[in-house]
């Protein structure tokens, strides 16, 4: 009854108005699984490749009809009749069918849409929520949210170099409390910006995108907002950064245009260390460029015992690259973006590989999202303990938070919220 009898893909639009792929997988029992894939703005060079049409006459070349066609023909034919309960076998079938090594032939967007839709169909067939189907009985830990309240870099049209400034509710006793805390700080921050005549328009991920005197001004505003909302910076609400340093790394220097600085790796590590001494920063993502492995080693040696150092562009959710990073003492955490690797099985393997190495894993959205809430379930299923899925505005972001509220309600008294325990790699 769990045999796949039909696979249908279509072109839909993401939160930036760009095309993306949505797939339906129908089982013999009549059960349907549906999944839509996201798309990133700052993209690691070793990510799995999403397939775009490159037809300038349509969506400025960003159409995905080729990927849709690949699902409706080759992929559909390859998995028709297979058992949806065998996720690993189906994902391996998709990887082998593509044959390219980086999913560039069929498209990671095509492959991932089917991989996730299969899992959702199988969960429905079993009468289980997705988090329980994927994770089993041991999935009871809610993730600590990393909420993007100020956007910059490639995610906003402003003068801030750093891509994300996030708030992290550590002192809450439940996910519901953490979400309320984040919302209160978010609205307090909006009031501060408005009072000072700054823009309160939001960026791709729902955070505010004001022009500021320099990068540090964002940290000052966030600390003030935390305090004005009635919380303690640090114990109640910590701060995280996504530098997205690859975006401003050129010719061996980190170019911080809002500060008028061009820093080498040592100087940029010093720059970040100064912030850590002044502000309650517990996490830094992509603190060095993906092309600056020596800089990453320096940063990890300098800060890795006191701050979570998350590798996004450098690891691209790839367990093999993570293994290389672990062996060289690079970072202490990995960001998990499903479309960076292209199948559910590979993403879950990357999470497990990180845990075995003593690294944390942060399940993440992309800047171009849809209403699909799969990553909320995956964060709980994998006991990843952390999730990064945007700010407290834009329904494409809130959809994930609301799904986590439902999951916590479903878990009842068995649900746990780890707070600072989510950062178990820190001394």
UniProtKB/Swiss-Prot annotation:
GO molecular function: magnesium ion binding; phosphopyruvate hydratase activity
Residues forming the catalytic site: 205, 337
Cofactor(s) essential for the protein: Mg(2+)
Residues that hold (2R)-2-phosphoglycerate according to the record: 163, 337, 366-367, 388
One GO CC annotation: cell surface
Pathway membership, UniProt: Carbohydrate degradation; glycolysis; pyruvate from D-glyceraldehyde 3-phosphate: step 4/5
GO BP: any one term: glycolytic process
EC number: 4.2.1.11
Matches recorded under Pfam families: Enolase_C (PF00113), Enolase_N (PF03952)
Localization terms from the record: Cytoplasm; Secreted; Cell surface
Predominant subcellular localization, coarse grouping: cytoplasm
Cited function: Catalyzes the reversible conversion of 2-phosphoglycerate (2-PG) into phosphoenolpyruvate (PEP). It is essential for the degradation of carbohydrates via glycolysis.
Protein's recorded name: Enolase
